[in-house]
Structure formats: C-alpha cells, structure tokens
Amino acid sequence: MKTIPLTLETEALARRFVWFEPPEEALSDTDRFVAYALARATHADMMLLRRFLMDDDLREALDRAPPGIIDPRSWAYWNSVLGRYPAPAMPVRRFG
C-alpha cells in the first residue's frame, strides 16, 4: 500500500476522520486511515485521496481494514464501486 503524504490537505482530512490522534500518527497506518476515510469521507475528500491511491490500494485497504471502523453500508458501497459484488464478509472483532 502506498503511503499518503502529510500535506495541509491530508492533515485536515486526518483531523476530521481520526480526530482522537495526531494527523502524523493517523496517516502512518495507511490501511487504518483509509478505512476511516471509506466510512467518513465526502466525495470531495475521496477525490483528494484518489490523487495518492488507486483502486488496487483501496481494495487492499478493504482487505486489511480493522474490524469496527467501516459500517455495513459503506462496506457494501465501496466493495461495489471497486467491482466486488456481492461484497465479501466484513471484518469481525475477536475477543479472548
């Protein structure tokens, strides 16, 4: 997966999507950051991120998404947009 550089624009996105940690930390884990983006980004936000990420990067982020970040509606939408229909099973949290 490609890294997303820290710019003024990506810093603003990181502050909105992953508000509970510094932007540098949020962007350091690309798969996790993209999972938050897939759940929370607007169309304009995704246009910005698509400057750095291709379809394969988004598919990879979906495959590696931590459980509990992407809601079912966003999961179905992004898998469909990326040519995966029906969508694979969502990530599941495991305890113990």
Feature map (PLM): residue ranges:
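Long, compositionally biased intrinsically disordered regulatory segments in eukaryotic proteins
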Residues: 1-96
